[in-house]
């Protein structure tokens, strides 16, 4: 049985409920039944000794108004919790991962340590993955044990970077455990490809899988393969590249926030979600650029170039099926991605919205 997520986000609802749903008490149902979309086998054998990874330096992240100090001053609680100001002050594994990556590149060991300690004690599951959400208004605050694979990837990447930079073997060990857990619990083999699932539960059933192209954080995946070339990340990278070259739809050949893959290889925008190049998919060109894969960013770049040439604003989303666009402009975070990939000047002030600010700072990274 699959848990189907909502097609639209009601006003006031946490955006990540759109992709996760509350699965508490239903996990046994999710893993039951026969399906041709099967979870990938658990990795076995010893974990190779980590290879040296590049050591981040402060020069590899922005300074001034768009920087880690500015971001942490606005969104980091002293406890180490990154606060999503756009979603009722919740926290999630994604935000913890973004914050930890930023702090590592900025050389802020104290903040990194606080964020990891909060994440470890609050979200870490026994299997090495992270519960995806912390809601201070809920009882208990962590009430959905499902993970968010992009959050796991970001945290594992940050731990690997920081463990190397600050010579912390425990962080490297935890990074390795998270990588193995991702491969064993958050991937699916379908249509002859091994692909990242958005979460362990609720996204693969009956020979189909719902996937999120923006969960391919290329600098992180490359770092995983470099640290542990025997774990299988080369396959994830190769098959993820295939996915992103195929997940192009409509007049402008843009990726959508969510796609559905069938066992025969048919790929389409996820039918139970809006067919938008929007909130999630804007990270596809960002991660492609940061990961040295400009070809994967090209459709978005060409679309944005066309908008500029026509003297039009960059819309918050475009419907790839109808061509309709949002009647409001993209956020400062998207504008920062456009400046990174197309050229031009990015917004000079950090947004007061968590997600837009994340995108702004990420666009300054030079992994």
Where are these regions (language model features)?
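Bacterial lipoprotein signal-peptidase II cleavage site
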Residues: 31-39
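Extended ligand-binding clefts on enzyme/binding-domain cores
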Residues: 61-66, 89-93, 149-150, 172-343, ...
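N-terminal secretory signal peptides
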Residues: 1-30
């Amino acid at each position: 049985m699959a848990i189907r997520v909502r097609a639209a986000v009601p006003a006031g609802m946490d955006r990540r409920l759109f992709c996760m749903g509350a699965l508490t008490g239903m996990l046994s149902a999710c893993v039951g039944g026969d399906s041709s979309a099967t979870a990938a086998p658990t990795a076995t054998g010893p974990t190779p000794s980590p290879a040296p990874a590049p050591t981040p330096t402060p020069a590899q992240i922005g300074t001034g108004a768009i920087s880690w100090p500015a971001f942490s001053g606005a969104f980091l609680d002293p406890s180490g919790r990154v606060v999503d100001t756009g979603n009722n002050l919740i926290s999630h594994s994604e935000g913890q991962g973004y914050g930890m990556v930023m702090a590592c590149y900025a050389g802020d060991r104290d903040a990194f340590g606080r964020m990891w300690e909060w994440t470890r004690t609050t979200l870490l599951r026994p299997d090495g993955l992270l519960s995806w959400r912390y809601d201070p208004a809920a009882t208990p605050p962590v009430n959905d044990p499902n993970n968010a694979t992009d959050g796991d990837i970001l945290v594992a990447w940050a731990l690997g970077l920081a463990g190397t930079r600050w010579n912390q073997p425990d962080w490297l060990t935890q990074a390795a455990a998270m990588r193995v857990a991702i491969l064993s619990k958050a991937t699916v083999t379908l249509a002859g490809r091994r692909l990242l699932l958005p979460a362990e539960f609720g996204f693969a059933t009956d020979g189909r899988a719902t996937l999120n192209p923006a969960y391919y954080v290329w600098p992180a995946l490359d770092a995983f393969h470099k640290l542990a070339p025997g774990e299988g990340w080369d396959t994830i990278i190769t098959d993820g590249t295939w996915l992103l070259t195929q997940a192009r739809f409509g007049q402008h050949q843009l990726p959508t926030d969510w796609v559905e893959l069938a066992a025969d290889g048919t790929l389409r925008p996820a039918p139970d979600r809006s067919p938008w190049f929007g909130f999630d998919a804007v990270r596809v060109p960002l991660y492609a650029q940061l990961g040295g894969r400009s070809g994967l960013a090209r459709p978005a770049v060409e679309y944005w170039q066309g908008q500029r040439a026509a003297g039009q604003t960059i819309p918050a989303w475009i419907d790839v099926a109808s061509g309709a666009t949002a009647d409001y402009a993209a956020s400062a975070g998207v504008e920062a991605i456009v400046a990174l990939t197309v050229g031009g000047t990015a917004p000079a002030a950090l947004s007061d919205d968590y997600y837009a600010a994340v995108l702004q700072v990420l666009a300054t990274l030079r992994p």
